[in-house]
C-alpha cells in the first residue's frame, strides 16, 4: 500500500481525494485502490483561509492524523498530494519532499509561472523522483 500525505486544505479536493482513497462516503465504483492518505497538514491559504477549519474536521472524521508542519510528514509517506489553490506556493510546498526523493502530485494550478514549473521539474529530476499534475477541466466544453 502506498502511503500518501496531503498538504494544504483549502480545496474540496482534499476531502474528495481522501474519501476515494480510503473507500469512505463514496460509491464503490469511485474507490481508488493501492494507496491511502496516512497523514495531512492543513497549511494556510491567502485565497480561502475560511475553508480550512471545515476541511480539517472532515479529514479528522476520516481518521487521518494531522501534523502542524509539512516536514513532519517526511518519513511517514511514500508520496505527496500538494493541494493548495495557490499555484504560486507550489514550488516551496513541494521542495522539501522532492529534495527527499518523494514523488509529488501538484493540484491545479500547477504553478503561476513557467520559471517555477521548470524549477519543480528540475528538483524532481535532480532527486530522481516524479512530479505530475492533472485537471479534468480540459474535457469541459467551456
Where are these regions (language model features)?
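Long amphipathic alpha-helical scaffold regions
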Residues: 100-102, 134
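Short, glycine/acidic-enriched loop or turn micro-motifs at the edges of active sites
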Residues: 11, 110-111
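N-terminal glycine-/serine-/threonine-rich beta1-alpha1-beta2 phosphate-ribose binding loop
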Residues: 1-100, 118-127
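Conserved Rossmann-like nucleotide-binding pocket used by diverse enzymes
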Residues: 5, 105-106
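A contiguous active-site-proximal alpha/beta segment in oxidoreductase catalytic domains
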Residues: 111-142
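Hydrophobic residues in well-ordered beta-strands that form the structural core
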Residues: 68, 106, 131-133
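Short helix/strand-capping hinge loops at secondary-structure junctions
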Residues: 101, 108-109
